[in-house]
């Protein structure tokens, strides 16, 4: 009896959840049942249903829409705006420490969640909507934070090295205290203010997830955080969520009309920890509709860095213009048929992104990347890392070896670190002891990490000048004795010692440009255990007095250097630069490509033939290779791929370059704004030049180049859904052309 009841409950729970589409395509703004047919014809695979606060709790209009969606077998996400509605924003604050907000939130969720949770095709909930900008990072919350972090005012005063008489310290006052005592204008009080803002947003997102789960415990109903409109909010989403919806529109964030700030997807994935479905701009604020080729390019860029689909932010923009609607439908159909479900990028390089430095500000002065600054007018002048880490994301997101991942300090776990060979760590200021230990183990196991100024600042005794013991040992450092700060501080880097990590950078090579690629902060260090690889500047501070031949002589002080150091650690290397390395340094500068390329290629099997910056975007994925032409011109693409076996790839010609190791050359031609997914369809032994042309869903044509010198074994790779495969094999060479027609059941060798 009990066993039967349990099965019944489980069956009912399973029925009360929609199926996640293999590729999630949706558009915001669908309101009426009459549009559902057009919505389906546009290729959409799911519904995005925005539910705003209603005092009366009447959702009858949504019920009519979702009843029809259920009949048409559409799954849907219910997007809840959990910010206080405009009429109540003067009454309470959007903050986890505001009791009035908690009362309102719980009442609203008590109304909306029970209404929708039993719907049969509910995929889950999206919680958010420009939450970072709406959160009240107020000084009352800062006081609560300080009380929880420090046991007494005496401890707070000791940590800040300032007399503090009350917990009610305004953040601006705390940060101005740093301005008066530190050359970098950033010390312990400012670090605490930044950590407060970071923690507040994290706690609010955690609160939302927990409150929703209390009212809907069905684990098949996914929780998505978003749409989130700052990179720093993507980096603090807690593990209570299964997915994230980034919306970094070029209208509001960086004006990246080429790729719609697609690195937001990499940030949100956090090394594959979250499902990511970005929202894309479809209509501008002035009413203009985005061109179809831009929507196609943005969608494919997002998929290349790991998106599971996209949400278009305005359904009417798609529905109103036939050209847009038809192109979107064709794009979705092609993705669903050509790109395997759940295809994910595979890269051995990641950026360790700490949401600290300001990076870039939006038009209203809101920091997009880090919590170091107060939002709004108080952000000026910039006082920390300027354009870092934004500059690094843009420089590396599509390079000659493919894509890069992004992880936060909370992904510094053995499991996630095992996926990478190289970590670039701009301003890695927050590293708890366990994170430091995992980072050291990563390097000892053969990894390479590149860090710069600010390393471990939160955990250091003197931020930006000393280092926690584990990091000091890992990087072979001592101390930074002096910080040279100023807008005119600019210099280049001169290599003083050749190193095998950089085989193409000789001793004496100058990295930079005519005005200097490094600054405006330099940290001067005395001699360290790690080897100096390159020097930024050398200074002698003070004088030394020595006694020689009965006389006291004054000699120049001990030299202190701003430099890049390389420390061998276990089987790997830890590299440290005593400046904000990527504030000014870009791919346009001499040596940028040699430095980064030498490291990235160590873990990469794929490479685009050409320069560091390529005309095409390439993503090596676990089920093939995605190649995108974002330009207005025809592109001939040539790739080199190191693999254990020799593959025939759809849409490309493949020929062997070498056998030990096995390297194959892949060539194809892409029309403007076009893309191709190169899927392994067969492997050949021995390696032999082959061109594959897909003739239909279950039909292929293989053209073998050159004359056969013997037997060639071809093993076909077919999806499990394939019932049969018709193959035409054409042989070109000195003998007349011959054709072989085969009809194969799946998993057959010829």
Predicted regions and their residues:
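Conserved small/polar residues in nucleotide/adenosyl-binding loops
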Residues: 740-746
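Hydrophobic targeting/anchoring helices
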Residues: 89-93, 216, 222-391, 511-516, ...
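A glycine-rich, often tryptophan-bearing local segment used as a flexible ligand/cofactor-contacting loop or short
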Residues: 429-510
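Extracellular ligand-binding/catalytic regions of CAZymes and related secreted enzymes
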Residues: 292, 318-346, 475, 539-700, ...
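The substrate-binding groove and active-site-proximal loops of carbohydrate-active enzymes
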Residues: 24-25, 48-57, 90-104, 128-133, ...
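Polysaccharide-binding and catalytic clefts of secreted carbohydrate-active enzymes
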Residues: 95-99, 103, 107-259
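Boundary/entry segment of secreted carbohydrate-active catalytic domains
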Residues: 19-38
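Aromatic-lined substrate-binding rim segments of carbohydrate-active enzymes
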Residues: 35-42, 46-93, 208-209, 213
């Amino acid at each position: 009896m009990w066993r039967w009841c349990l099965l019944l409950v489980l069956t009912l729970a399973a029925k009360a959840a929609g199926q996640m589409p293999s590729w999630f395509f949706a558009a915001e703004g669908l309101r009426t049942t009459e549009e559902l047919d057009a919505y389906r014809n546009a290729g959409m695979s799911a519904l995005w249903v925005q539910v705003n606060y209603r005092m009366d709790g009447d959702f009858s209009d949504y019920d009519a829409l979702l009843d029809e969606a259920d009949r048409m077998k559409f799954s849907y996400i219910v997007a809840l705006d959990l910010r206080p509605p405009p009429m109540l924003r003067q009454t309470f604050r959007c903050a986890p420490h505001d009791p009035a907000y908690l009362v309102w939130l719980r009442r609203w969720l008590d109304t909306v969640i029970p209404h929708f949770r039993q719907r049969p095709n509910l995929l889950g909930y999206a919680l958010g909507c420009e939450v970072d900008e709406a959160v009240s990072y107020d000084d009352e919350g800062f006081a609560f934070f300080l009380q929880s972090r420090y046991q007494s005012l005496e401890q707070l005063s000791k940590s800040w090295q300032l007399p503090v008489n009350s917990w009610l310290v305004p953040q601006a006052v705390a940060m101005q205290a740093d301005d008066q005592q530190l050359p970098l204008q950033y010390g312990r009080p400012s670090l605490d203010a930044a950590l407060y803002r970071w923690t507040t947003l994290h706690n609010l997102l955690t609160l939302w997830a927990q409150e929703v789960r209390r009212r809907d415990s069905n684990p098949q109903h996914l929780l998505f955080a978003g749409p989130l409109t700052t990179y720093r909010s993507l980096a603090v989403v807690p593990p209570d969520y299964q997915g994230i919806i980034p919306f970094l529109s070029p209208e509001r964030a960086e004006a990246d009309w080429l790729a719609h700030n697609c690195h937001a997807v990499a940030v949100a994935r956090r090394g594959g920890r979250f499902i990511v479905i970005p929202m894309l701009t479809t209509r501008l604020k002035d009413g203009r509709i985005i061109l179809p080729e831009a929507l196609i390019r943005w969608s494919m860029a997002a998929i290349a860095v790991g998106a599971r689909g996209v949400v278009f932010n305005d359904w009417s923009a798609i529905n109103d213009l036939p050209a847009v609607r038809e192109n979107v439908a064709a794009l979705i159909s092609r993705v669903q048929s050509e790109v395997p479900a759940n295809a994910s990028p595979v890269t051995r390089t990641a950026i360790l992104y700490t949401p600290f430095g300001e990076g870039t500000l939006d038009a209203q002065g809101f920091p997009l990347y880090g919590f170091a600054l107060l939002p709004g007018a108080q952000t000026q002048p910039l006082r920390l890392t300027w354009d870092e880490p934004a500059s690094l994301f843009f420089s590396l997101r599509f390079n000659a070896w493919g894509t890069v991942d992004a992880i936060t300090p909370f992904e510094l776990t053995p499991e996630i670190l095992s996926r990478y060979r190289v970590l670039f760590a701009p301003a890695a200021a927050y590293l708890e002891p366990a994170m430091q230990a995992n980072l050291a183990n990563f390097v000892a196991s053969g990894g390479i990490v590149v860090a710069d100024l600010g390393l471990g600042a939160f955990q250091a005794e003197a931020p930006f000048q000393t280092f926690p013991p584990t990091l000091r040992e890992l990087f072979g450092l001592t101390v930074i004795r002096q910080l040279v700060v100023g807008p005119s501080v600019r210099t280049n880097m001169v290599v003083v010692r050749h190193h095998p990590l950089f085989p193409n950078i000789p001793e004496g090579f100058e990295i930079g440009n005519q005005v200097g690629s490094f600054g405006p902060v330099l940290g001067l260090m005395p001699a360290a255990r790690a080897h100096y690889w390159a020097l930024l500047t050398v200074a002698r501070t003070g004088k030394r007095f020595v006694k020689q031949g009965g006389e006291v002589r004054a000699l120049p002080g001990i030299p202190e250097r701003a430099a890049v150091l390389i420390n061998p650690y276990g089987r790997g290397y830890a590299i440290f630069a005593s400046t904000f390395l990527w504030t000014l340094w870009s791919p346009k500068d001499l040596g940028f490509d040699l430095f980064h390329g030498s490291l990235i290629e160590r873990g990469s099997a794929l490479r685009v033939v050409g320069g560091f910056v390529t005309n095409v975007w390439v993503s090596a994925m676990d089920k093939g290779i995605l190649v995108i032409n974002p330009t207005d011109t025809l592109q001939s693409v040539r790739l080199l791929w190191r693999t254990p076996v020799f593959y025939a790839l759809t849409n490309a010609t493949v020929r062997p370059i070498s056998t030990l190791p096995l390297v194959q050359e892949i060539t194809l031609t892409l029309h403007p704004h076009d893309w191709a997914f190169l899927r392994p369809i067969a492997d050949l032994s021995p390696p032999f030049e082959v061109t594959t042309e897909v003739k239909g869903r279950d039909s292929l044509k293989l053209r073998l180049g050159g004359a056969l010198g013997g037997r060639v074994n071809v093993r076909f790779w077919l999806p499990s859904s394939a019932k049969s495969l018709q193959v035409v094999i054409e042989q070109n060479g000195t003998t007349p052309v011959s054709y072989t027609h085969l009809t194969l059941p799946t998993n057959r060798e010829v």
